[in-house]
Amino acid sequence: MPCVQAQYGSSPQGASPASQSYSYHSSGEYSSDFLTPEFVKFSMDLTNTEITATTSLPSFSTFMDNYSTGYDVKPPCLYQMPLSGQQSSIKVEDIQMHNYQQHSHLPPQSEEMMPHSGSVYYKPSSPPTPSTPGFQVQHSPMWDDPGSLHNFHQNYVATTHMIEQRKTPVSRLSLFSFKQSRPGTPVSSCQMRFDGPLHVPMNPEPAGSHHVVDGQTFAVPNPIRKPASMGFPGLQIGHASQLLDTQVPSPPSRGSPSNEGLCAVCGDNAACQHYGVRTCEGCKGFFKRTVQKNAKYVCLANKNCPVDKRRRNRCQYCRFQKCLAVGMVKEVVRTDSLKGRRGRLPSKPKSPQDPSPPSPPVSLISALVRAHVDSNPAMTSLDYSRFQANPDYQMSGDDTQHIQQFYDLLTGSMEIIRGWAEKIPGFADLPKADQDLLFESAFLELFVLRLAYRSNPVEGKLIFCNGVVLHRLQCVRGFGEWIDSIVEFSSNLQNMNIDISAFSCIAALAMVTERHGLKEPKRVEELQNKIVNCLKDHVTFNNGGLNRPNYLSKLLGKLPELRTLCTQGLQRIFYLKLEDLVPPPAIIDKLFLDTLPF
């Protein structure tokens, strides 16, 4: 049976001791004639890594692929392998594979006479593709019969069955790669290239395994089919530091949850924003139904019930208040004929007489609501330290203490209301003199209006701007009869069920109005008209105003009542000045003198 054998021959004279020569023969034995110097071409020094072939070199696919029972007679191919420094080699681990077995029954003398680098024996499995064009061969998978690697003596002549009985794994081999030659390249210019040592684990790799070589990822399919029977570009293999067993990281699991936001009301998962705030679908629907139905809820506890994912349905009042506290805007909820149509225009209007809803200035009313919310004390931070509902409290203490408390409550509210006024859109654009005039003229009106809206007249509980909570009886000796008028106004105001948006517009109109002595009354009038139109649109289309006739007139009718209450407040301050028990603060004295109507 023809076979190919590689012999580690003796180096010719003048050759480097590290030089190695391999000869291929087809007769089944080795001839020393091919190892004579005339067949050897020494064209490189010890640092050169090229190998010159004197005859035609088969393609690498042919060299590695076709192993069967015969091999055609080929011209001898002589390889000169000079090594410099340390030998470039492949380290084969002591791991057995299915076709690589260790045999330890070689003669001792043969093992001693073997060279350090070893020799290579390839068992052919099929005829290779000759270099002559037009020669047809049968192709077969590359790794069906990979053969074995063996070491043997330089003069050892072996047949196929002898080699299979006396084979041991090679410890070190030379690493090489073939490169495709250009068309018309002379036969003598075929080259093999050494790329340095490489550590190759011999354990079997599964099909489709991925490896990384020089930063490039490639896969080893199973089985590997032989490409076209011609040369192909050489595969550049990196140094030993880049191992072939590096695995590509697995892709991230598709079942990992996405990082969605949380509902600002209850803490449940929220995918997007609804009515200006990131909320879940449950809180969005609850807020929408509450606004559309204009529902009024009552808290059975202390109006501070916990609102979370598990307990959000226990108290509707506290849940709706938290929706407003986190910034959900009621004006965005549609309550007209387009409700539930997701922005699609109706095919036919219900009746041609129904007025089409204009686009309300959402930015203005939203800014007014935000300014009101920011200037009000939080319900969870109220100060009940001085609250007493004892009717005998008004008889305790002296008058100076109650008068001083009255002045303190006024001055404490002044800075808070001024901060609220500066957040009204367009107010800061007015002249500074007009701003001061409008604020000082409307301070007592705003003090009464805001106090009446947040207080609880049924229980006689008064909540001031700084968060202090007092009973009505605790304010009688300081406020006089004025406190009774405030409580009565508060009761009438809350009976109207004014929502926070409408109240914010009313509070702005109480200050932005015509006053005597304005430098630019035209600009004040323009701002006033914007707020009135905003309130009108809100009441008409978003607050059930179509079913509540004269509701807008009733809201605007509260402004003259505030003027009357403001006059009562000035009279109370004037009376306290006449008593002269406690001197008023300078800011209150200036306010009194600047706003006297007489």
From Swiss-Prot:
Pfam families reported in the protein's UniProt record: Hormone_recep, zf-C4
Molecular function GO terms recorded: DNA binding; DNA-binding transcription activator activity, RNA polymerase II-specific; DNA-binding transcription factor activity, RNA polymerase II-specific; nuclear glucocorticoid receptor binding; nuclear receptor activity; protein heterodimerization activity; RNA polymerase II cis-regulatory region sequence-specific DNA binding; RNA polymerase II transcription regulatory region sequence-specific DNA binding
Entry's Gene Ontology cellular component terms: chromatin; cytoplasm; nucleus; transcription regulator complex
DNA-binding region (UniProt annotation): 260-335
Expressing tissues: Shows a ubiquitous distribution in the cerebral cortex, hippocampus, thalamus, amygdala, and midbrain. Expression increases in prenatally stressed adult offspring in the ventral tegmental area, whereas no changes are observed in the substantia nigra area (at protein level). Not expressed in quiescent liver but is rapidly induced following partial hepatectomy and is specific to hepatic growth as it is not induced in other mitogen-treated cells. Expressed at very low levels in the lung, spleen and stomach and at high levels in the brain.
Biased composition (Pro residues): 352-361
Motif Bipartite nuclear localization signal (NLS1) location, chain numbering: 287-314
Transmembrane intervals: none
Motif (nuclear export sequence (NES2)): 568-577
Main location: cytoplasm
Domain notes: The ligand-binding domain (LBD) contains no cavity as a result of the tight packing of side chains from several bulky hydrophobic residues in the region normally occupied by ligands. NR4A2 lacks a 'classical' binding site for coactivators.
Purpose: Transcriptional regulator which is important for the differentiation and maintenance of meso-diencephalic dopaminergic (mdDA) neurons during development. It is crucial for expression of a set of genes such as SLC6A3, SLC18A2, TH and DRD2 which are essential for development of mdDA neurons. May confer liver-specific regulation of delayed-early genes induced later in the G1 phase of regeneration along with NR4A1.
Protein name: Nuclear receptor subfamily 4 group A member 2
Organism: Rattus norvegicus
Protein's gene: Nr4a2
